[in-house]
Amino acid sequence: MQQSYNPQNSLTATTSYSEQEIVCICESLFNEGLQTGRTEQLANFIYNLPQCYQVMESVLKAQALVYFTTQNWKMLYKLLECSKFSPHNHTVLQNLWLDAHYKEAAKTKDRELGAVCKYRIRKKNPFPNTIWDGEETNYCFKSKSRNVLRDAYKKCQYPSVEDKRRLAQQTELSIIQVSNWFKNKRQRERAAGQLDRSSARSNDSDDGSSGCESKPPMNIDSPAPPPLPTSFDLQPYYPSPYTFAPHCDFSYIQNL
């Protein structure tokens, strides 16, 4: 029978684990916390670790998620600004950074944030260099990601599901984001009179409405594009689940 987690026994348990076991447990509980929004078990585990383990990157990342779920914004910002994280952790921590600022601003304004307000928040609160490699982003799409998508678009304007999955892995985006980029790219070129009409097919039905790059130059003789809406509604943001190392043995978690 699987042993249930008992916070009263956590101090004894945490002192008996090796560093690798602590990393595996933290990563698993972190991923579970991202999915469920519940971090009580994660908090009990890391708070009872010996002081020498408190500076481990997996523990610091777990602490950041606990601060996020408990809406302790100041401590979250301080931790992310003062602790250097490895590049493979940047994306998930950047998501926490942005979502925390969005939630904090929405609570202050007592209303849901629009696209313009979120854009201003991102400009006012850039990522600290502890979770950012310094590469320029455009609507949260990195330059290298946009270049990969542009090259793929030149080869095929209607990628298959498998192509989208491959591009999502290459660009570190979701399949929906890749689908939206191709859809909006086709729409912009159609409006500019640049898309080959014979290539338009019924599979131009990807869901979503988020674009990533600027409009192409307009031809004076081309038909004018439809007017832009006066407001924009963004889909709710959910942090992406963290993918942990394959060597982690999660059998340790059964003993919690």
Curated annotation (Swiss-Prot):
Residues 134-193 bind DNA. InterPro entries: HD, Homeobox_CS, Homeodomain-like_sf, SIX1_SD. Acts as a transcription regulator. Binds to the sequence motif 5'-TCAGGTT-3'. Binds to the cis-regulatory element of proapoptotic factor egl-1 gene and together with eya-1 activates egl-1 expression to promote motor neuron M4 sister cell apoptosis. Also promotes apoptosis of I1 pharyngeal neuron sister cell. Together with eya-1, required to specify the coelomocyte fate in embryonic and postembryonic precursors. Required to establish and maintain the differentiation of all 14 classes of pharyngeal neurons. Belongs to the SIX/Sine oculis homeobox family. This is Homeobox protein ceh-34. Its main location: nucleus. GO terms for molecular function: DNA-binding transcription factor activity, RNA polymerase II-specific; RNA polymerase II cis-regulatory region sequence-specific DNA binding; sequence-specific DNA binding. It comes from Caenorhabditis elegans. Interacts (via N-terminus) with eya-1 (via C-terminus). Transmembrane segments: none annotated. SMART domains: HOX (SM00389). GO terms for biological process: mesodermal cell fate specification; positive regulation of apoptotic process involved in development; regulation of DNA-templated transcription; regulation of transcription by RNA polymerase II. Keywords: Developmental protein, DNA-binding, Homeobox, Nucleus, Transcription, Transcription regulation. Disruption phenotype: Exhibits early larval arrest phenotype. Does not affect the number of pharyngeal cells or the expression of pan-neuronal genes including ric-4, ric-19 and unc-11. Several neuron classes fail to acquire their neurotransmitter identity including 7 cholinergic, 4 glutamatergic and 1 serotonergic neuron. Alters the expression of neuropeptidergic genes in pharyngeal neurons including the reduction of glr-2 in M1 neurons and the elimination of mgl-1 in NSM neurons and ser-7 in I2, I4, I5, I6, M2, M3, M4, M5, MC and MI neurons. The keyword Transmembrane does not apply. It is found in: Nucleus. It comes from the Eukaryota. The gene is ceh-34.
